[in-house]
Swiss-Prot record:
Protein name: Small ribosomal subunit protein bS6
PANTHER family: MITOCHONDRIAL 28S RIBOSOMAL PROTEIN S6, SMALL RIBOSOMAL SUBUNIT PROTEIN BS6M
The gene coding this protein: rpsF
Taxonomic lineage of the native organism: Bacteria, Pseudomonadati, Campylobacterota, Epsilonproteobacteria, Campylobacterales
Organism: Campylobacter lari (strain RM2100 / D67 / ATCC BAA-1060)
Keyword Chloroplast: no
Gene Ontology MF, one: structural constituent of ribosome
Recorded GO CC terms: cytosolic small ribosomal subunit
Keyword set, alphabetical order: Ribonucleoprotein, Ribosomal protein, RNA-binding, rRNA-binding
Amino acid sequence: MRHYEVLFILKPTLTEEEVSAKLEFVKEVLTKNGAEIESVVPMGTRKLAYKIKKYERGTYFVIYFKAPTNLIAELERVLRITEEVIRFLIVKYENKKEIAAWEKLSKGIKQNKKEIKASESTEG
């Protein structure tokens, strides 16, 4: 299994329910085709560097996952035909140095989420 990262941008006009439904849809495509999702990073709604399909803003997500190579073509196909996705990028981590960076990123994100939850529970 290879290490990958997919970043995708959703239309800013979607409601929170629609955004979470699309995120679950992408995660389902990954898991049904044999991927192991390591972490999901919701980056929120941000201003785009330039207009994409008449939108100036977009809701960003990054998913770190391990998958067989044949999954990537299916993931690309699904993201291309999904109207709510305005742009996506799939990155493959190949050599040992890149894989070490991938592991650090995916584990660091998990650790940060645990720290945030712990600080929220002690405050409230």
